[in-house]
């Protein structure tokens, strides 16, 4: 196993943010990461969101990187435009995968948060489509879904 200076032999580049903190003896609130996309420092809120979303730490030249919220959304949109294959309803996803929707691991295609059972259920009950992007099934979380379906303020009429 290859090792890098100052890193343990057991896991030189932990991809989980909590394992990274443990390996270096840091608390999550003391961790400082740069965004892999824009190279700016992640705010405390960005680090916490990165952890909650269970995203993987990216290593470049021996240094760990995360992703800020703005870049995650931009990267999600780019992935959606470049790698969208098709969209379909839940029963089709279950038929194609052979796995019930509640058991499938899915992320929000906008913010990348893992979808909860309730969010998947809301998509099924609301007869919303799931999207195959980069070969993975995705949907939208409740937070991003509400922003996607909110009426356009410009289209409101005055009474």
UniProtKB/Swiss-Prot annotation:
Q: Name one GO molecular function term.
A: zinc ion binding
Q: List the disulfide bonds.
A: none
Which UniProt keywords are listed?
Activator, DNA-binding, Early protein, Host cytoplasm, Host nucleus, Host-virus interaction, Inhibition of host innate immune response by virus, Metal-binding, Modulation of host cell apoptosis by virus, Transcription, Transcription regulation, Viral immunoevasion, Zinc, Zinc-finger
Naming one, the record's GO cellular component terms include: host cell cytoplasm
Gene3D superfamilies, per this entry? Answer: E6 early regulatory protein
GO BP annotations listed: DNA-templated transcription; regulation of DNA-templated transcription; symbiont-mediated perturbation of host apoptosis; symbiont-mediated perturbation of host ubiquitin-like protein modification; symbiont-mediated suppression of host innate immune response; symbiont-mediated suppression of host type I interferon-mediated signaling pathway
Q: Which HAMAP family match?
A: HPV_E6
Q: Which family does it belong to?
A: Belongs to the papillomaviridae E6 protein family.
Assembly notes? Forms homodimers. Interacts with ubiquitin-protein ligase UBE3A/E6-AP; this interaction stimulates UBE3A ubiquitin activity. Interacts with host TP53 and EP300; this interaction inhibits TP53 activity.
Q: What does this protein do?
A: Plays a major role in the induction and maintenance of cellular transformation. E6 associates with host UBE3A/E6-AP ubiquitin-protein ligase and modulates its activity. Sequesters tumor suppressor TP53 in the host cytoplasm and modulates its activity by interacting with host EP300 that results in the reduction of TP53 acetylation and activation. In turn, apoptosis induced by DNA damage is inhibited. E6 also protects host keratinocytes from apoptosis by mediating the degradation of host BAK1. May also inhibit host immune response.
Quote the protein name from its UniProt record: Protein E6
Q: Which organism is it from?
A: Human papillomavirus 27
Please spell out the taxonomic lineage of the organism that makes this protein: Viruses, Monodnaviria, Shotokuvirae, Cossaviricota, Papovaviricetes
